[in-house]
């Protein structure tokens, strides 16, 4: 699963997801893409699940690009813990996705295959998505 090798700080603020994606919203590498339509967090597990579906579906014919990277650590406290005693330990990593962000791009396959592969991948995503063709 994806995670950064090192970060400047161990813990980050959760932040707010405002506005549309200004970067990473164009089809850059492939011919077909999966684009988010709403803001949200994609965990490294969800990104990996989508990658597995796409690689199995397109076999060796297509090439896949993952356009997002989980670089934000999400901390959690143990259950039944009183308030105070600092912020919790990092539990998992997420990628912040805004509306318009391209999540996956593929090339080297026909449009019907790409469309059905992206549809299956979209079921694994926590945000609404759409299929984009060049």
UniProtKB/Swiss-Prot annotation:
UniProt family annotation: Belongs to the universal ribosomal protein uL16 family.
Taxonomy, superkingdom: Eukaryota
A Gene Ontology molecular function term of the record: structural constituent of ribosome
Organism field: Oltmannsiellopsis viridis
Keyword Ribonucleoprotein appears in the UniProt entry: yes
Database matches in NCBIfam families: rplP_bact (TIGR01164)
Subunit structure of this chain's protein: Part of the 50S ribosomal subunit.
Chief place where the protein resides: plastid
Keywords for the protein's UniProt record, in alphabetical order: Chloroplast, Plastid, Ribonucleoprotein, Ribosomal protein
A GO term from the CC aspect: mitochondrial large ribosomal subunit
PANTHER family: 50S/60S RIBOSOMAL PROTEIN L16 (PTHR12220), LARGE RIBOSOMAL SUBUNIT PROTEIN UL16M (PTHR12220:SF13)
Database matches in HAMAP family: Ribosomal_uL16
GO BP, sorted A to Z: mitochondrial translation
Protein name: Large ribosomal subunit protein uL16c
Chain segments annotated as coiled-coil in the UniProt record: none
Location of this chain's protein in the cell: Plastid, Chloroplast
InterPro entries listed in its UniProt record: Ribosomal_uL16, Ribosomal_uL16_bact-type, Ribosomal_uL16_CS, Ribosomal_uL16_dom, Ribosomal_uL16_sf
């Amino acid at each position: 699963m994806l995670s950064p090798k090192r970060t400047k700080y161990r813990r980050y603020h959760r932040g707010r997801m405002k506005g549309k994606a200004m970067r990473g919203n164009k089809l850059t590498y492939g011919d077909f893409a999966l684009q988010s339509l709403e803001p949200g967090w994609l965990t490294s597990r969800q990104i990996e699940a989508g990658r597995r579906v796409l690689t199995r579906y397109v076999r060796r014919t297509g090439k896949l690009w993952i356009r997002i990277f989980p670089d934000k650590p999400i901390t959690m406290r143990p259950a039944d813990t009183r308030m105070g005693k600092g912020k919790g330990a990092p539990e998992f990593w997420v990628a912040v996705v805004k509306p318009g962000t391209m999540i996956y791009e593929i090339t080297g396959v026909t449009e019907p295959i790409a469309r059905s592969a992206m549809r299956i991948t979209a079921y694994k995503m926590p945000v609404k998505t759409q299929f984009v063709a060049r």
